[in-house]
Amino acid sequence: MGHRISTQSRGKGGPTYRAPSHQYKAELKHFGSALETVRATVIDIEHDPARHTPIAVVKIEGKASDKKEYALITEGVGIGQELVWGPEATVVNGNSLPLSAIPTGVAVCNIEARPGDGGKFVRSSGVQAVIIGKSAGKVGVRMPSGKPKWFNEACLATVGLVAGGGRIDKPILKAGKQYHKMKTSATRWPRVRGVAMNVIDHPFGGGGHQHPGKPKTVARGASPGRKVGSVAARRTGYRR
């Protein structure tokens, strides 16, 4: 019976490669819209295994439910602060309002791709986008990558930058720290090179020294255990 290599295990998608979504606390979306204003008060700040940024537990004004409501927050938002979503919100840190109501040059985050979808862009810890212009029902935003992107003016966005900035500034220092960090995500770590494996574990494994021992190019229709290296490569080597 053949030996299943790590590439095939990843394709099967076992627990090691699946995101721990059963631990996620909530799907964070805007509570209001371009036509409806919602107010809430931050009552606590918690950690969510789904992301690297802290999230806020909020109490929606006029809502009697005891169910916890969560919101994505910006840097500087604290317990007891009022957050507002909708057209009546003012342009202050933490509030969410239509892009048409946000002045040019203001930093924003958690931008909707389409009005009412709850927020899709600029949601990672410490990131921000900047309003750069408005034209014919569209609002231009400079994304964290530096590229401009145009959105419908009715899309909601949160004023400020996402909380949790500076997270990657602290060095890992120890492999054990990195191990536990990677265990929280759908990533297998460390990633071992094929030439460093035994011959049974990878087509490039084994031998007296580390080398593939065969051409790295492989056909598109190769069997799963062989399909490693340069798959269906048009060319290999350095360009001249």
Curated annotation (Swiss-Prot):
Tell me the function of this protein: One of the primary rRNA binding proteins. Required for association of the 30S and 50S subunits to form the 70S ribosome, for tRNA binding and peptide bond formation. It has been suggested to have peptidyltransferase activity; this is somewhat controversial. Makes several contacts with the 16S rRNA in the 70S ribosome.
Identification of the protein by name: Large ribosomal subunit protein uL2
Identify the stretch(es) annotated as Disordered: 1-20, 204-240
Aminoacyl-tRNA synthetase keyword on record: no
Q: Name one GO biological process term.
A: cytoplasmic translation
Source taxon at top rank: Archaea
GO MF, one term, reads: rRNA binding
What lineage is on file? Archaea, Methanobacteriati, Methanobacteriota, Stenosarchaea group, Methanomicrobia
Regarding protein family, the annotation reads: Belongs to the universal ribosomal protein uL2 family.
Q: Name one GO cellular component term.
A: cytosolic large ribosomal subunit
This protein's gene is called rpl2
The family database entries (Pfam families) matched by this protein are listed as:
Ribosomal_L2, Ribosomal_L2_C
